[in-house]
Amino acid sequence: MVVLEECMNKLCLVTYTRKNEVYTTHLDELALELYHIYGNGFKVIIYCEEFFDLPKKPYHIQLIKYHGTKYKKLLHLFSIDKSEYFISIDNDITPNTYDIKSFLEIMIKENYSIGWGKINVSKYSNVWELMVLIDKVLSHNIIRPTLWKLNTGISIPGQFFCLKRSIFDSKLLNTDTYLDDLAIGLYVSKYIDKRYISDKILGSEAPNNTFMGLVLQRWRWGIGYSTLLLSIWDNCSYRRRLLIHGFAYHFLWIIIWFLCYIFFEINIILGLIYLGVISFIISKPKNLVFYSFIYEIVFPIFHIVWGISVINTIIRGRKHNECL
């Protein structure tokens, strides 16, 4: 296998394009800023499904045609590139360049093994986009940091993270999954103490804006979760962390609804106060309290879809194994 460069670069930005996608101006602007800081120690690698024309850039940039999940592409990157740090960023992300530069400065100066921040929703003009915004606030501001503080977190934002190559080289799960964030997070949770979790919003993305789009997304996440769960089942520590993650992200609403039922049984006013408090906690900005209330009622539909997908995939996986 040919290594891209024998000399060690400081920083490699890796992104991923699907068919009919091209390298975005947003990422190019970020890359130019990083090139001005790191010079020839900076490079960009684009994993693409189809080659496309790239205008000449002052920084080194390379297209690699490679099919498969983002996780498989990351594993492939470890085998061909020797940069000291990898920044993985989705092609559709609008990066917050100023905060990313500050984030990387701290990451490298303090010799962190891995780091990430928050990803925001770039627009919310209809009710589904508002639901996703509230769900992201709940995930990034409450569930994820709480689980990491309890030493049971495994979720990192797959849209953007930075890791030190030498710490993870040949250490990550040798599997295939849609959920690269959880596959990497499992290893981080168990073995990596030196992690930089920034409270800054490092980028934004356009949310799914239709009901069916969210259904299909959650179905795909369910497939990714269950295949990952089956692949690590014999690892007790990984299994425990993954099950806790699944409960916290996809079944917390059951507890919320159960408590809501209890409070309404006691007193209608008490029940309404409870719903109002929960809506206020998960809404940001605070003028979205009404939509947070709607979120509590509607969004469990997508968690149920996720659960059905998980059960369906596990049953099919076990039947497949029995036939082998």
Regions found by a protein language model. Name each.
Residues K19-Y35:
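Short, well-formed alpha-helical segments that are part of the catalytic scaffolds
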Residues Y249-H320:
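Membrane-embedded multi-pass helical conduit in multi-pass membrane proteins
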Residues Y71-K73, T97, F103-S170, T175, ...:
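Long helical/loop segments within the catalytic core of UDP-sugar-dependent glycosyltransferases
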Residues K65-D81:
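Glycine-rich, basic loop-to-helix element that forms the pyrophosphate-binding segment
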Residues S83-T94:
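Short beta-strand-to-loop acidic/aromatic patch adjacent to the donor-nucleotide binding site
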Residues N9-V14, A183:
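Cell-envelope/extracellular polymer assembly enzymes that use nucleotide-activated donors
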Residues M107, I114-H140, T175-T177, L182-L242:
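Catalytic donor/gating beta->alpha subdomain of glycosyltransferases that bind UDP-sugars
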Residues N40-F51:
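Short beta-strand/loop segment that forms part of the nucleotide-sugar
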